[in-house]
Amino acid sequence: MNILAIIPARAGSKGVPNKNIRLLGQHPLVYYSIKNALQSKYITDVIISTDSNPVRIIAQQMGAKVHWRDAELAGDEVTLDAVIYDAITTDKQWDYVITMQPTSPTLTVGTLDSAIEYAIKSKLDTLISAINAPHLSWGEKDGKKIPNYEKRLNRQYLPPCYMETGAFVISKADIVTESTRIGVNVDVYEIPERESQD
């Protein structure tokens, strides 16, 4: 089985400039997702999609491949779907493509591999990392703030509410297009909150 991990790590960031190469502990942020992908017992190839020379150097030093991202795919308005689709190499027939964000440095390779096993065993089109975060949240309708709950309850009594973490999106390769990585048969994979730090 051929499983490709793609790590999108562009140079620009509105929130934190050069965030992917900033040190977190002893290593640049992007190091952690590359390390997990390379250490996975299921991922066969790792590609970093970047327009950053420092990220390119880090990736190559670690043994990952680099896909140089064109300027038109490095802007703030570009969807991740288009970036991932652009980075998929055609030198192999891929079974799965995994998007791994550098902004989830606390994810463990054990959790990643368990999720891959679950996606394959369950024959899912897409598996998305998430945390269970049942909070008393509010939304907006017609300009008014309204509660997203019917009754105020303690957190442990609230129904599950899963929030995507961005740590990974595991997709069957044949459903990945320029506009989506989400198929019909979709599930979320609950990861520990400590592994969802962004």
Model-derived features with residue positions:
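N-terminal glycine-rich phosphate-binding loop and ensuing alpha1 helix
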Residues: N2-S49
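Short, high-confidence coil segments that cap the C-terminus of an alpha-helix
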Residues: I43, K92-W94, K123-L124
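Short beta-strand scaffold positions
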Residues: S49-T50, I170
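Short phosphate-binding loop-to-helix
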Residues: N53-I98, L107-S114
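Conserved core of the sugar-phosphate nucleotidyltransferase
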Residues: A82, D86, P105-P192
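Extended, histidine- and acidic-residue-enriched regions that form the cofactor-binding/catalytic faces
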Residues: Q93, R194-Q197
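Active-site acidic Asp-centered loop
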Residues: M100-P102
